[in-house]
Amino acid sequence: MIQFSILIPTFNNLDYLKLAIKSIKENSIYNHEIILHINDGSDGTLEYAKKEKLIYTYSKDNIGLCSAINKAATKVSTKYVLYLHDDMYLCKNWDEFLKNEIEILDDDLFYLSGTNYEIRDIDNKYNPGVSPEKFNPHLFHEFCTNKKEKDLQGSHWAPHIVSKRLWDIVGGFSEEFNPGDGSDPDFCMKLWINNVRI
């Protein structure tokens, strides 16, 4: 059985976080490890994590995305690290697609990412609801089932997954990029330097 450690940094965004975690639990084929880093958490996130028995790290103040992810990564116990935003919702069977791709590869020097759709006016625009309360999972699942995307090379969208071994080799996210701007392309550059071509 394959299992991922899903790292989610969060900063007082509880309603979205709950929806993201619901999507992991309801739309995954496999049972994954969910690890939060809670920045501040004064909106009830800390109590929610305790009640749900989630694995988490915590900082009283917002330490920035890169530091938050790196702290959460200290709790990883699986072979794969997946980075997810706290306001994302995963398609049904999302993990099966990643598992199938990973099994094709000859080694663990890879970086795989998903396709990110947003309600804003970008190339990948789609609106299944503008808030957690208005989100329509049935509409979203229909979209995921019918939308066909080409595989992209060179994308650095979250969610993305690497092996834990590779994460450790490159040292996770570079904390000089806190609060987080530029951290994704920097992470990809560190992977490139370490011979990652997929």
What are these regions (language model features)?
Residues 92-131:
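Conserved donor NDP-sugar-binding/catalytic core segment of glycosyltransferases
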Residues 153-171, 176-198:
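A short, conserved alpha-helix in the catalytic core of glycosyltransferases
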